[in-house]
Amino acid sequence: MNTDFPCADRKVIVALDFDDRRAAEELVERLGDACGFYKIGLELLTAAGPGLARDLVERGHEVFLDLKLFEIPNSVAGAVRAAGALGASMVTVHGMGGTGIMSAAVEAAREFPRLRVLALTVVTSMTAGDLADIGIEADTEEQVLRLARLAVGAGCDGVIASPREAGVLRELLGPDRLIVTPGVTLGPDVPAGGAAGGSAGGSVGGPAGGPVGGSAGGHARAGTPQAAFAAGASHVVVGRSIARAADPVAALRRARAAGNSCG
């Protein structure tokens, strides 16, 4: 297991949640040397192909491929090896796929010492009601912890969960494993060229540092970088709060300051 923690300027991962490569590259250009870590999800990967990820790595950036792999173990292993060959630093596998899928991902990643396998616990858009719809009686926190335990047993480097579960996960996982939290907003005071908050909207003060007012951006369990880092997150993923800010570099610095203040 790779237990290296990020340097301060790479605790904040900027989500390239775009549907074409040109828009993603425009944000990368605006951020310049200020950003060292980007997330590429299924939308951009499908629209732009793997070339952007490779190019970002070649420029010295780290890349988080958020693939949420949930397939037969052989297919998951193949996808993880492909992510490693691109030079990715992180790749996600669905914890709900069980130990077999996660173990296959971990084994495949051994060929790539820099690649960290993270288990997605419960997607940040899901609530207890959504879990009940698929026959899971546990609430979201219980399910997150259950899947985190499975991830530890499978040898994953860390987990993906909302900011609201970062504290209980740090208690469970100890100091070494990574806890990466999407669903993060900088709050309404970010100067925005459009709707701020995409990853989540609002400011400190809601439950577990969640948003007070504003759009949740599709995340039912959102939070701020301050709350996430204070609770024990190793990284936060920030999307539209940076991408749609009038000054993306200033917005990124605000998010990074939250990580620096938490050590």
Please identify what each model-predicted range represents.
Residues 1-21, 25-27, 166-172, 191, ...:
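N-terminal amphipathic alpha-helix/helix-capping segment at the start of soluble metabolic enzymes
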Residues 6-10, 71, 75-158, 162-167, ...:
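Conserved anion-binding
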Residues 13, 36-39, 64, 89-92, ...:
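Conserved beta-strand positions in the central sheet of alpha/beta enzyme cores
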Residues 14, 38, 68, 91, ...:
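Conserved, mostly hydrophobic/aromatic
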Residues 16-63, 73-79, 149, 163:
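Conserved alpha/beta-domain cores
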Residues 30-31, 56, 83, 151, ...:
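Generic structural signal for hydrophobic
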Residues 33, 59, 86, 112, ...:
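Structural motif
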Residues 102-108, 229-231, 242-263:
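C-terminal helical cap(s) of enzyme catalytic domains, especially alpha/beta-barrels
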